[in-house]
Each structure stands twice: as structure tokens, then as C-alpha cells.
Design a protein with these regions (language model features):
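Solenoid-like repeat scaffolds
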Residues: 62-67, 96-102, 132-138, 167-174, ...
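Single-residue signature of alpha-solenoid repeat helices
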Residues: 56-57, 88, 127, 161, ...
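Residue at a conserved register position within TPR or TPR-like alpha-solenoid repeats
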Residues: 47-48, 75, 82, 115, ...
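Start-of-helix register in tetratricopeptide repeats
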Residues: 38, 73, 106, 143, ...
């Protein structure tokens, strides 16, 4: 089951620098009279800009909230670093109430982020337009451009994301985080060694104890584009060690790292390793602090991964049982489960395609996420097997032209590029 994870949204929600750092243009007026609150806010923002996460940020968030309980942006930031997601949402909603009496910039920013903060951010794209307007009215506010860049990345609009990050760097001060996202744009441009060199340079500037998500996953993607599976996995294993050492695994389970390793193994024919990684990742869920509905979602993702792995193993009956389990979970989830139907059709299409039932696979694959390059890859394979060459070629072209920022593009792009040149 696939969806923008809460971790991505938390990271996207927390970027900023001192308003006084803006080189030109109007920026937010902070609605607090507490110098201590401003100091703590800047310290927390600086840590995030340097990929410093974990318990120290949680404590900073608590101190920030206590230093001025009526400071809307301070409470907002406290909500971002709060590991208990129910409490984080409660704090965010409180910041919205406080924002009604805050400055125009603070109020509009906090309200614009509602789509990225509630319901696990499933409608995060709706936050983009109000932030664009906010950026036009406050051209010197770096925070807005950093958030826009990440939301554009999440929406598969890499060029717009890069423009936003460049604006943020121009406003200043320059940061490792923005540089890492710009290195990610080099990947979309096909400049893999250059992107790795940028990541390595950025890493050297980081303080000890940093946990550079964007760097480790970016390096992984660069190796996937070049077909170097072992190097791709090595980067994620390094990140797993850093994630644990920082205590982040006590805030959000390490399952997403294992699932990424599982998927890389799966799509490169390392099926036993894939199954073990999916199962190992899920072990971090039952005793975690996640709300029960999110634990259920991750259980669904385990069944999803097992289904695809079993299908690749040729165990088609077992695979379909897993697919039916996912389908039942979605139905049982009622209204909340409806968002996962595209993920189910991707799964069913995957299983049917592996079983040689291409016509049935196509029926499902036409109902998947058309913005997901890997879903599109399966659709292209189905079209090609059915002799529908023009439609296959169009699908492969769509993958090559995609600007999706996640793991799906590096998994799909090499095959799509090769097929596009040979069909």
C-alpha cells in the first residue's frame, strides 16, 4: 500500500531560517515578544537544516512551546518535532487557533499547511497554491520556498521544486538541506556522478550526528540509475545505522528503510532477500508508538510486499491470497480505506502480469496511480506483451519524462529508457 509517508510530511513541514537572514523582500513578522522563543526557534530550524533530528529536537520543541505558549509559529514547530502523532496533530490544531491572532504571514502559513498536516498529508498538494500566493506576498521568506520545494518534489514537479530551492538559497543563508535537494534535481537531469559528488561535498559540511535522509536516499537513487544494486543498498544500510544511532527509530519505525531495501532487492531478482527485508521492517511496527490505524496501514504494506515477492517467485496462488487480504483490508477500512484502491489495483496488476494473465493485469493497471513511474512501467509492459506497441512506447516515454522524486523513478527509468530506444 502506497502513500506519502508521515515522515516525509514532517520533514517538509519544518524548514526555516531566521527572518533577519533574508537578503531582500518582505518576510514574516514573528508574533512573540520573547527573545528566548526566537532564539529556540532559530536553533531548532538550524538543526533541521543540517539534518539533525531525534530526541534533542523534541526537547527543543518543548522548550520553545514553554517559552511563549501564545507564539503560534513556535507551537507549530513544536508540533512538527513531537513524535507522538496524535499529540502532534493536537498541537498543530492549537497553533491554528493561536494563528488567528498572529501576524498575516504566520497565520497564512500555518493555515496553508493544513492539507500537509492532517489525515497523514494525503491531500498535501492542496497546500501548494496558498503557499505560492504567500511566497509572492513575502518574497524574502525562505521558509515558504523551502516548503514549496519539498511539496513540488512530492508532486513530481522537479523543475518547480528546483526553482523554489534556488530562491531559498538566494534569500539565504545557504544550507546543506537545500543543496541536497538541488543535488536530487541533478539526478532527474541524468547527471549521476555529479549528483553523488554534490552529496559527498554536502556530507562533509554536516555536524557530527547528522542523519542525512536526502543524501543517503539520493546516493541510493544515483546507483540504481546506473544499475549498481550493491552500492544502492550499502547507502541505505548506512542510513539505517545512522537512524538507529540518533534515536529516530524510537520516534518513527525504521520500516520505511527496510521496505526500500526490500523493493530494490525485489526488482533486481533478489527474492529471498526481498522477503526477509519486508518481514524485518514490519517487526518495528507492532511495539512502536504509531497510532493503531497507521499500524494497520503498515501491515497492509507488508501483505503488499509479500504478494509482489511471491508473484516474482512464481508462487501465484499464494501471491493472490495476499492480494485478496489487502483487498479485504481496504473494504474493512470503509471511507478511510478508499485512498488505497489504486495501490490495490497496482498490486493485482503486478500479480496478474507475473502470472501471465496480461489482459486481466491491464484491467487493473489502468486503474493505478498514473503519476507513479513504476505503475506506468507495469502498464507499459502489459501493452507491449499485448502487441500494443504505440501505447507501450507512450507509457515508456512518460516514465523517461517523469520528474517523480521517489524510488519509483530510478527503479523504472533504466528499463523505460532502453525500451523507448528499441521499440
Amino acid at each position: 500500500m502506497s502513500k506519502k509517508p508521515a515522515l516525509f510530511l514532517a520533514l517538509a513541514a519544518a524548514i526555516g531560517v531566521p527572518a533577519s537572514a533574508a537578503t531582500s523582500g518582505k518576510h514574516f513578522e514573528l508574533t512573540t515578544k520573547s527573545p528566548e522563543a526566537v532564539k529556540l526557534l532559530r536553533e531548532l530550524q538550524g538543526r533541521i537544516e543540517n539534518f539533525q533530528f531525534g530526541p534533542p529536537n523534541v526537547e527543543l520543541g518543548k522548550k520553545l512551546a514553554a517559552s511563549d505558549p501564545n507564539f503560534a509559529l513556535g507551537i507549530y514547530y513544536a508540533s512538527v518535532v513531537e513524535p507522538n502523532q496524535d499529540e502532534a496533530l493536537k498541537q498543530y490544531q492549537h497553533s491554528r487557533e493561536l494563528a488567528k491572532k498572529a501576524s498575516d504571514g504566520e497565520r497564512r502559513f500555518i493555515e496553508a499547511m493544513v492539507h500537509a498536516r492532517v489525515n497523514q498529508g494525503v491531500d498535501f498538494k492542496k497546500s501548494i497554491d496558498p503557499l505560492v500566493g504567500l511566497g509572492q506576498d513575502y518574497p524574502g521568506e525562505r521558509l515558504v520556498q523551502m516548503i514549496l520545494g519539498q511539496l513540488y518534489n512530492g508532486d513530481g514537479k522537479g523543475d518547480l521544486a528546483a526553482d523554489a530551492f534556488r530562491k531559498a538559497q538566494a534569500i539565504g543563508p545557504r544550507s546543506a538541506r537545500a543543496e541536497a535537494f538541488l543535488a536530487g534535481h541533478e539526478l532527474l537531469e541524468g547527471h549521476y556522478p555529479q549528483a553523488r559528488a554534490q552529496y559527498e561535498s554536502i556530507e562533509k559540511s554536516l555536524p557530527k550526528g547528522s542523519v542525512p535522509f536526502a543524501i543517503r536516499f539520493g546516493v541510493t537513487f544515483s546507483h540504481l540509475y546506473e544499475g549498481n544494486v550493491d552500492a544502492a543498498l550499502a547507502s541505505l544500510k548506512t542510513y539505517l545505522d545512522e537512524y538507529r544511532a540518533s534515536g529516530l527509530d524510537q520516534q518513527f519505525p525504521e520500516v520505511f528503510i527496510w521496505n526500500a531495501m526490500a523493493r530494490i532487492n525485489l526488482e533486481n531478482g533478489r527474492l529471498e532477500e526481498a522477503m526477509k527485508a519486508y518481514e524485518k521492517g514490519y517487526e518495528s511496527i507492532p511495539n512502536s508508538k504509531l497510532p493503531e490505524d497507521q499500524k494497520t496501514t503498515w501491515l497492509g504494506r507488508l501483505h503488499h510486499g509479500k504478494c509482489r515477492t511471491l508473484a516474482r517467485m512464481g508462487k501465484h496462488e499464494e501471491a493472490w491470497k495476499e492480494a485478496e487480504t489487502v483487498r479485504k483490508m481496504i473494504i474493512d477500512g470503509g471511507e478511510a480505506g478508499r485512498q488505497y484502491w489504486k495501490a490495490y489495483h497496482y498490486l493485482a496488476g503486478y500479480a496478474k502480469l507475473e502470472a501471465g494473465q496480461t489482459g486481466e493485469a491491464l484491467e487493473h493497471l489502468l486503474q493505478t496511480d498514473e503519476t507513479d513511474p513504476f505503475h506506468t512501467l507495469l502498464l507499459a509492459r502489459a501493452y507491449e506483451r499485448l502487441g500494443r506497441k504505440d501505447e507501450a512506447k507512450a507509457a515508456y516515454k512518460k516514465i523517461v519524462e517523469s520528474q517523480a522524486a521517489g524510488i519509483e523513478r530510478p527503479l523504472a527509468y533504466p528499463e523505460a529508457k532502453e525500451k523507448l530506444s528499441s521499440l
